[in-house]
């Protein structure tokens, strides 16, 4: 096989809670994640150049080692002493800096695609083990579907498929830094946390309205005061028939 076309699915959070800040500075989370049918497409091909190259339809995206696509290709090229070069054409449709794992899912697609092209024989679990070296969300983007993530996001438990429903996504013209959000998160006794266990139970029951009622993202306590447009969008969605709206 010389080339392959791979879909890289976006993800949304149905629930996100931060349990505590660990001594190493990382935050321990519990979140329920779901892949959706919005995706980037990656055309991956091998050549004799020995180099990793990429191009994309978005001029502002890096196409060097600063892109997770490049890092994923480099990881497998180095580990398996692959002499051939790899070229990736990234057709980017997932909004950038939207919390939808756009970079991570592209990296996951490269791991999957190179595994096929070079006949590496890696299982999904083995791909996930390599994915975590690139980013905490990459293993989930390989797993896909509905899942509970714990730890710093790397401990994954598969959940029953989410009940099918339409999803509307709005991306305002803002870019929220993950570092900014976590640095300004105040984990106090007065904070209202989403009930992740109840949300998981709702998913098992396949009750859309219970799921909607129990959705929540504790990071909104930081983002909404800083970017009121998020609240405006949520209100607009609720006024026009959404069963719930969440960042």
Briefly describe each language-model feature range:
Residues 1-98, 116, 120-128, 152, ...:
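ATP-binding N-lobe of GHMP and related small-molecule kinases
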Residues 72-79, 126, 130-133, 214, ...:
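Generic non-transmembrane alpha-helical segments
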Residues 89-118, 136, 243-247:
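Glycine/serine-rich anion-binding loops at beta->alpha junctions
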């Amino acid at each position: 096989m010389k080339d392959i076309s791979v879909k890289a699915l976006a993800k949304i959070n149905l629930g996100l809670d931060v349990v505590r800040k660990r001594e190493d500075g990382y935050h321990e989370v519990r979140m329920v994640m779901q892949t959706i049918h919005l995706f980037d497409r990656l055309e991956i091909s091998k050549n004799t150049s020995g180099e990793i190259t990429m191009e994309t339809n978005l001029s502002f995206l890096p196409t060097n080692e600063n892109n997770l696509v490049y890092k994923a290709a480099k990881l497998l090229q180095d580990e398996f002493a692959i002499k051939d070069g790899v070229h990736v054409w990234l057709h980017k449709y997932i909004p950038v800096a939207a919390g939808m794992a756009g970079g991570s899912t592209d990296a996951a697609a490269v791991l999957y695609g190179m595994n096929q092209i070079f006949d590496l024989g890696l299982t999904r679990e083995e791909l996930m083990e390599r994915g975590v070296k690139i980013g905490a969300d990459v293993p989930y983007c390989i797993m896909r579907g509905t899942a509970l993530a714990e730890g710093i996001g790397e401990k994954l438990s598969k959940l029953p498929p989410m009940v099918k429903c339409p999803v509307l996504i709005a991306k305002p013209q803002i870019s929220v830094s993950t570092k900014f959000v976590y640095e300004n998160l105040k984990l106090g006794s007065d904070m209202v946390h989403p009930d992740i266990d109840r949300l998981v139970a709702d998913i098992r029951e396949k009750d859309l309205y219970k799921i909607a009622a129990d959705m929540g993202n504790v990071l909104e306590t930081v983002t909404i005061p800083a970017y009121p447009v998020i609240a405006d969008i949520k209100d607009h969605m609720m006024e026009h028939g959404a069963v719930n709206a969440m960042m």
